Structures are given as structure tokens and as C-alpha cells.
Amino acid sequence: MNTVPFTSAPIEVTIGIDQYSFNVKENQPFHGIKDIPIGHVHVIHFQHADNSSMRYGYWFDCRMGNFYIQYDPKDGLYKMMEERDGAKFENIVHNFKERQMMVSYPKIDEDDTWYNLTEFVQMDKIRKIVRKDENQFSYVDSSMTTVQENELLKSSLQKAGSKMEAKNEDDPAHSLNYTVINFKSREAIRPGHEMEDFLDKSYYLNTVMLQGIFKNSSNYFGELQFAFLNAMFFGNYGSSLQWHAMIELICSSATVPKHMLDKLDEILYYQIKTLPEQYSDILLNERVWNICLYSSFQKNSLHNTEKIMENKYPELLGKDNEDDALIYGISDEERDDEDDEHNPTIVGGLYYQRP
């Protein structure tokens, strides 16, 4: 077990540790969270009482340092810091515990939900997606865009003749560097296999993604889980797009190892089970889920996911699913600029359009 002390709580805030949260009043004598399980990554997240739209937080692994939270009045944020003096850190923690000013990490539930939500998420992979190498923890907030979103916006601005720069373009530390998934790219569609690769993404999934970029299914699932959690905790739109794209890529492939399908079904079950119902309109794309569960190659492989979706979100399912198609974020101008119909187009993952 480990501890994250807080130096103070000068403003009212909702504090979350993993999937649990609680409110702290202004200047309440609160000094941290103790008994955090070691062995998983964790996330501490914040939402200020006077700023309902902004959510932010820090991913960390207790084994990688002595972390504490300090409020920065200049930026108006609770910031994670690292104390490199181990003895000093232990003395501070002991003092706060003695004064009973810390809350305990909630008792692990029967299903060990946090393990199931983060089974494949590793801190070293997080730090590659959230590129801020000087820290042993990673900051994420609701406003962060993905590198791929920035490229799409940059391309659109250039085509419109604008000199404006895409937000976060020059600040990779404030972007999420998820793996680019582009179904129209040269990597996805091989010369001589255009129709095959257009209809069935097995080559793109198995050869390009699993064998090439990710090296194995564990790394693939790690990014999928991380994207979901960033979408859920921070309402991060780009993360929601990445989560849907990675699910869609598997479901659009006829050839997928059975162990991978079984694990995907388990992962999605716990994700949908944990997702707060009030977020469904924002984070669940009706079109994508209908395709995956009822029209895709893998429509008979996700039994647990289908069951919990039908029980929890019946209003999202079963609407003309056989004829639904993905709506890609590709403009007419981008089509006109292609040398041929299979040249890659810069897209922000799979962009799904709500009806």
C-alpha cells in the first residue's frame, strides 16, 4: 500500500482516486489518500466546484516515486509533485496519519473492477502517449487533443488558406499521442488487395497493428483501456474517438485470435458496467455499437458486452443496424486532392457522426 499526501485543500473540489470520488470543502482539514494498492497504475482526478467543465488529473504508479499534491494558486490547479527525499516524505505521511487527516483508499470491490479496467495499462506506455519525460507521472485534462486531431485540423486550416495554428500543435506535452488508425492509409490497404482490405481489416489489424506497431495484443488492449479511462474520467473527446476506433478495428476484421476476442468481450463488459449513465450521450456512439454488436464480423463474439449494453443502454441499440455505415471525417477537398482512390488521407481516427 502507498500514500499520496495533500499539503492543503484551499478551494472546494471533487477529488477522485480511480473510479471513486468524494467532495472536499474549502480549507477542510484534508491531507491525502492512504492505503493505495501497489501493483496497478492509478489516477487522481479533480473537478473544481466553480469550474464544472474542466476535469484534470494525474496518472501514476506508486512504485515509481513519492508523490504528493500541492495547490498552485497561480495556475489555479492542484498539482502532483515528487519528493525525492524518502525520509522527509515518510515523516510527513506519518504526521498526517497520526492526526487522522487522510482518507483510506476504498475497499476493493468483489469484482476488483480497477484491475479489470487497467489490466493492460502500463506506466511506461502512458508516458509515451502523454509525452512529458521529466516527470514520473502524467497529466491529462478534458481539453487535450490527440496528435491525429491536430493534424486533421492543421490540414483543414491549410486547405482553407488560414494561417492559424491548430491548438496544441507546438506543444506535444499537451497532446495525446495515440496510435494513428486510418482505414484508408497505404498501410491499411495493400496494392492488389484493395477490395479485400477495404471490406475486411484483418491485414491491418493483425499484420500492421498487432505484429508491427503494438507487437502484441496486450499493448493494443493497454491503449484501448487507457483511451476509455481518459474519456470517462476527463470527458476527453479525442480519447473517446480512439477507444471507438480500436474497438471498430477489431470488429471489422474477420480473422481475430479467439483469446483476443474473449478478452475484448471481458474488457468492454467492465467498461460499460463502470461507465456512469449520464455520460452515455457523450461517450457512446450509437452507430458504432450497433455495427459492432449486430452487423460486424464479430457480431457473435461479444456476448457479455451485448448483454450489458442491451440491459443498460437499450435506447442506443437496434436502430437500422444492418444498413448503418461509418461516417469518416474526410472532406470533399481531401478526396479531390488524392492521387488515387487509395492514397492515405489525414483523418482524426475514425470520426463518427451522430444522426
From Swiss-Prot:
List membrane-spanning regions. Answer: none
User: Phosphothreonine is carried by which residues?
Assistant: T274, T345
Phosphotyrosine sites (modified residues): Y328
One Pfam family this chain carries? AAR2
Q: Which GO terms describe its cellular component?
A: cytoplasm; U5 snRNP
> Superkingdom, according to UniProt?
Eukaryota
Region annotation (Leucine-zipper) maps to 261-282
Task: Give the UniProt keywords, A-Z.
Answer: Cytoplasm, mRNA processing, mRNA splicing, Nucleus, Phosphoprotein
Effect caused by changing S253 to D/E: Disrupts interaction with PRP8
Chain spans, region Disordered: 331-355
**Biological processes, Gene Ontology terms:** spliceosomal snRNP assembly; spliceosomal tri-snRNP complex assembly
Name the CDD domains for this protein. Answer: Aar2_C (cd13778), Aar2_N (cd13777)
Report the locations given in the UniProt record: Cytoplasm; Nucleus
Regions of compositional bias (Acidic residues) in chain numbering: 331-341
Q: Which residues carry this modification: Phosphoserine?
A: S253, S331
Coiled-coil region: none
Similarity field: Belongs to the AAR2 family.
Please tell me what else the database record remarks about this protein: Present with 7330 molecules/cell in log phase SD medium.
Please give the function described in this protein's UniProt entry: Component of the U5 snRNP complex that is required for spliceosome assembly and for pre-mRNA splicing. Involved in splicing pre-mRNA of the A1 cistron and other genes that are important for cell growth.
Subunit structure comment from the entry: Heterodimer. Interacts with PRP8 (via RNase H homology domain and MPN domain), competing with BRR2 for the same binding site. Component of a U5 snRNP complex that contains at least the U5 snRNA, PRP8, SNU114, AAR2, SMB1, SMD1, SMD2, SMD3, SME1, SMX2 and SMX3, but is not a component of the U4/U6-U5 tri-snRNP complex.
- The protein depicted here goes by the name A1 cistron-splicing factor AAR2
Q: Which organism is it from?
A: Saccharomyces cerevisiae (strain ATCC 204508 / S288c)
Q: What is the lineage of its organism?
A: Eukaryota, Fungi, Dikarya, Ascomycota, Saccharomycotina
